[in-house]
Amino acid sequence: ACPKGASYEAGIVCRITKPALLVLNQETAKVVQTAFQRAGYPDVSGERAVMLLGRVKYGLHNLQISHLSIASSQVELVDAKTIDVAIQNVSVVFKGTLNYSYTSAWGLGINQSVDFEIDSAIDLQINTELTCDAGSVRTNAPDCYLAFHKLLLHLQGEREPGWLKQLFTNFISFTLKLILKRQVCNEINTISNIMADFVQTRAASILSDGDIGVDISVTGAPVITATYLESHHKGHFTHKNVSEAFPLRAFPPGLLGDSRMLYFWFSDQVLNSLARAAFQEGRLVLSLTGDEFKKVLETQGFDTNQEIFQELSRGLPTGQAQVAVHCLKVPKISCQNRGVVVSSSVAVTFRFPRPDGREAVAYRFEEDIITTVQASYSQKKLFLHLLDFQCVPASGRAGSSANLSVALRTEAKAVSNLTESRSESLQSSLRSLIATVGIPEVMSRLEVAFTALMNSKGLDLFEIINPEIITLDGCLLLQMDFGFPKHLLVDFLQSLS
C-alpha cells in the first residue's frame, strides 16, 4: 500500500486531464471487447424438478462468444474516488451446447443434446479505484455492474418442445447473469492492472537507454480529481542498476493546469541525475577527425588557411588530426525561469600525428563553461536554443592550469617552440573558437542525438500537438495535447494475446 496525503514528494509528476481521457475513451470499446473475449466461461450443471417430468438434469457446455459489438461509452472522474466508465448497448451473442436428461412417463430415459445461441444486450458500469503497491499503480473495480436489456434463447432449429425452451430460458438467464458478472468484471480488473504495468514499463523504456535506466516507482497513491488524474514518481536515473538517490521535493499541484491534455513536471534533481548517469556511462565525449573538424569550421565560415590553423598543425597534414572534448566531472544542471543552466568543466585536446608515426604535437586546455539553453519540440524534432554562455579558464581548480599546454612528443624528448606570448595568443584564439564554433556544434549534435534516441523509443509515432517546454525555478514543465496513440493500443492488445 502507498500513503495518501496533501503533500506529494516526487522527482517526476504526470497529470492526465479530462480532455485526454475523452480521447483515450474513443477506443475503450476494444479493451472491453477483449475483456469479454478473454474471460473464461465455465461449464454449469445441475437439476430441477419439473411437473410431470420429475427431476431434469441439465448442463451448459462450451459457452463462448460468437459476436460482440459496443455502441458507446462515457468516462467521468469522481473527485477523490474513482474513474467511472459507462458502456452502453453491449450486444453479445453467446453460443454453446445444452445437455439435458429426464425419465419419460413410459419409463424411458431421455438424454438429449442441443446447440443454442443467446442474443443479449447489456449495459456495463465500471467504477475503478487507483491505488499502488510496491511502487506500481494498481487498479481495483469494486463496483462493476451489468444490466441486461435483452436475453433471448435460440435452440438449434427450434425443434425442441416449447416447455423445454421456457424452462431453460429462465434457468440460462439467471445463470448467465451470474457468470458474466463474475467472469467479465474479474477480467476487466485483470486487464486494467496489465494496462497499468504496460504504461509504466513503456514510460520507463522511453526514459532509458543502454545501461542508463530510471526508477519511476510511484511515491504514493495516484490522485483523482474532477478534472484530472495524477501520478507521482521517484525519477532516479540509474547506471548499471545503481542509482544515487536524492531527497525528493514537494510537488506544488498549482504549477500544472487542466486545460491541456497531458502535463509532466520534472525536478531539476532528475536532470542532474540523468547527467550523472550519462557521465558515468562515458557519453559526455565528442571526438572529431581532422577532416570533420575542418568541415565544422568551414560550415561556420572560418578560413582554415588562416595563420592560427597553420600554427596549430605546424605544417602537419590536418586529415589525420584528432580533436577531443570531454567533461572532467559531472555537469551541474539547474532550471531557472530564463532557461536550463548547464555548468560543465571540459578539457579540449588537439592532436596532430606526424606522418612517420613517431611523434605528435598535442594541445590541451581546460575550460569552465556555463550555458543557458531553452528547448522546443516540433515536426518530431528537438531543438536547443542557446540564450547565453560564459567560458572561464579553469585556473581556480587545484591541479589545473590556465595556460595552454603544448607538447611535441618524440621517442626521446619533449620540447616546445612556442614563446609565451605566442602561446597566449594561440590560447585566446582557441578559446574564441570553442565559444563561437564548439558550443553550437555540441548543441547541434545533442539535438540530433536526443531526437534519434526519442524516435528509437517510438516518440515519433505519437501525434503530439502544440507541445510546450517551460522552465521555472527548480523544475521543467512539459505540456501538450495529443491524438489517440493507436500504435500503443495495438501493442497492448497484442501483449494480451
UniProtKB/Swiss-Prot annotation:
InterPro entries: Bactericidal_perm-incr_a/b_dom (IPR017943), Cholesteryl_ester_transfer (IPR017130), Lipid-bd_serum_glycop_C (IPR001124), Lipid-bd_serum_glycop_CS (IPR017954), Lipid-bd_serum_glycop_N (IPR017942). Gene3D superfamilies: Bactericidal permeability-increasing protein, domain 1, Bactericidal permeability-increasing protein, domain 2. GO terms for molecular function: cholesterol binding; cholesterol transfer activity; phosphatidylcholine binding; phospholipid transporter activity; triglyceride binding. Disulfide bonds join C144-C185. SMART domains: BPI1 (SM00328), BPI2 (SM00329). Expressed by the liver. Residues 1 form the signal peptide. Keywords: Cholesterol metabolism, Disulfide bond, Glycoprotein, Lipid metabolism, Lipid transport, Secreted, Signal, Steroid metabolism, Sterol metabolism, Transport. GO terms for biological process: cholesterol homeostasis; cholesterol metabolic process; cholesterol transport; high-density lipoprotein particle remodeling; low-density lipoprotein particle remodeling; phosphatidylcholine metabolic process; phospholipid homeostasis; reverse cholesterol transport. It catalyses: cholesteryl (9Z-octadecenoate)(in) = cholesteryl (9Z-octadecenoate)(out); 1,2,3-tri-(9Z-octadecenoyl)-glycerol(in) = 1,2,3-tri-(9Z-octadecenoyl)-glycerol(out); cholesteryl (9Z,12Z)-octadecadienoate(in) = cholesteryl (9Z,12Z)-octadecadienoate(out). The keyword RNA-binding does not apply. One of its GO terms (cellular component) is high-density lipoprotein particle. Glycans are attached at N89, N99, N111, N241, N403, N417. SUPFAM superfamilies: Bactericidal permeability-increasing protein, BPI. It comes from the Eukaryota. It is found in: Secreted. PANTHER family: CHOLESTERYL ESTER TRANSFER PROTEIN. Involved in the transfer of neutral lipids, including cholesteryl ester and triglyceride, among lipoprotein particles. Allows the net movement of cholesteryl ester from high density lipoproteins/HDL to triglyceride-rich very low density lipoproteins/VLDL, and the equimolar transport of triglyceride from VLDL to HDL. Regulates the reverse cholesterol transport, by which excess cholesterol is removed from peripheral tissues and returned to the liver for elimination. Belongs to the BPI/LBP/Plunc superfamily. BPI/LBP family. This is Cholesteryl ester transfer protein. The lineage of its organism: Eukaryota, Metazoa, Chordata, Craniata, Vertebrata. The gene is CETP.
